[in-house]
């Protein structure tokens, strides 16, 4: 059997294969209330029907002010749970495990009114200047991640991912470019890591399932975080109880990364080896053979697919055929692969 279609365990959760749908914002909550819609159900469940092992929902805000836009999903109140439970049931009906990415946009929120960040530094000259979070407000953010994790449990999710990448709030705390604080949340790396550590520990108080953290392994900017900074961060995450690190890059500043097939694989490889923690990797992985090579060379443990799954919900089915594997799909569509 190919490695790509072997089972993988995240704590007590067994994935049927190593293909993961990357969280990708759809900006499709037209009512602006954070509640998942029929579109979200069709969008995610179709990828489960296509054979994806783990489907991770897009960035889901833990606070209303933490949305990237007014059209984001949310888990800041109980009214948002039932629609997500319905969606999770749909994922499970096709044999996929269900994950959700809990997030706070920080200074990258594009919303009416006040936005917040670790320091009062705007994303760019076109963006609103955020208000620096007080210590009390930081503790409330941590508490809201915990509350959202509890709601995710109520909705039946199998996996929680904490979004600490792409220039959003937690990443803003981690990077010295965006964190100029002089209290115990700023300065040395251990202080800048504190909010993420506090969030992980708070989530674990209500959640006994696997926790993934998405990181940006380089800021692509002078004075920002580089790969070597993430080895100690990853070790601390492992000690805090994180099962796997989802390795991406960039997003903190308005700089386009150099992009080519598998461009983030070296980052996942180095973190995996340097910190002794499992990693998932994404970034222009578009073919089954490419994914298999990454796994067989032990450069990552899970393959996270983004845009290719937008183009092709049946990526898993097609990847299996390319690797000489047979996986079941919806019987209604079986003639498509004869």
UniProtKB/Swiss-Prot annotation:
Pfam families xrefs: Oxidored_FMN (PF00724)
InterPro entries membership: Aldolase_TIM, NADPH_DH_bac, OxRdtase_FMN_N, YqjM-like
Root EC class: oxidoreductase
Signal sequence, start to end: none
PANTHER family recorded: NADPH DEHYDROGENASE C23G7.10C-RELATED
Stated family: Belongs to the NADH:flavin oxidoreductase/NADH oxidase family. NamA subfamily.
Protein name per UniProt: NADPH dehydrogenase
Organism for this UniProt entry: Listeria welshimeri serovar 6b (strain ATCC 35897 / DSM 20650 / CCUG 15529 / CIP 8149 / NCTC 11857 / SLCC 5334 / V8)
Protein's gene: namA
């Amino acid at each position: 059997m190919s490695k790509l279609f072997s089972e993988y365990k995240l704590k007590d959760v067994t994935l049927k294969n190593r293909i993961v749908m990357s969280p990708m914002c759809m900006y499709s909550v037209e009512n602006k209330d954070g509640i998942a819609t029929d579109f979200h159900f069709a969008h995610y469940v179709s990828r489960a029907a296509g054979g994806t092992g783990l489907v991770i929902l897009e960035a889901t805000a833990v606070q209303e002010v933490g949305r990237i836009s007014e059209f984001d999903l949310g888990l800041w109140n109980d009214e948002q749970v039932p629609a997500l439970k319905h969606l999770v049931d749909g994922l499970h009906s096709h044999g996929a495990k269900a994950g959700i990415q809990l997030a706070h946009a920080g200074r990258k929120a594009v919303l009416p009114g006040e936005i917040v960040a670790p320091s009062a530094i705007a994303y760019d000259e076109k963006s609103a200047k955020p208000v620096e979070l007080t210590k009390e407000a930081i503790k409330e953010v941590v508490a809201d991640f915990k509350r959202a994790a509890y709601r995710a449990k109520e909705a039946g999710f199998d996996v929680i991912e904490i979004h600490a990448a792409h220039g959003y709030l937690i990443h803003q705390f981690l990077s010295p470019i965006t964190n100029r604080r002089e209290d115990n949340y700023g300065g040395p790396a251990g202080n800048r890591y504190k909010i993420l550590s506090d969030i992980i520990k708070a989530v674990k108080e209500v959640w006994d399932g696997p926790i993934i953290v998405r990181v940006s392994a380089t800021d692509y900017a002078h004075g920002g975080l580089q790969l070597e900074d993430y080895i100690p961060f990853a070790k601390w995450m492992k000690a805090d109880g994180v099962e796997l690190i989802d390795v991406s890059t960039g997003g903190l500043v308005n700089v386009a990364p150099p992009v080519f097939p598998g461009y983030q694989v070296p980052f996942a490889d180095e973190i995996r080896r340097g910190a002794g923690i499992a990693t998932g990797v994404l970034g222009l992985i578009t073919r089954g053979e490419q994914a298999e090579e990454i796994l067989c060379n032990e450069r990552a443990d899970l393959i996270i697919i983004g845009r290719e799954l937008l183009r092709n919900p049946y990526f898993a089915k097609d990847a299996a055929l390319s690797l000489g594997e047979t996986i079941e799909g919806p019987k209604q569509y079986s003639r498509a692969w004869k």
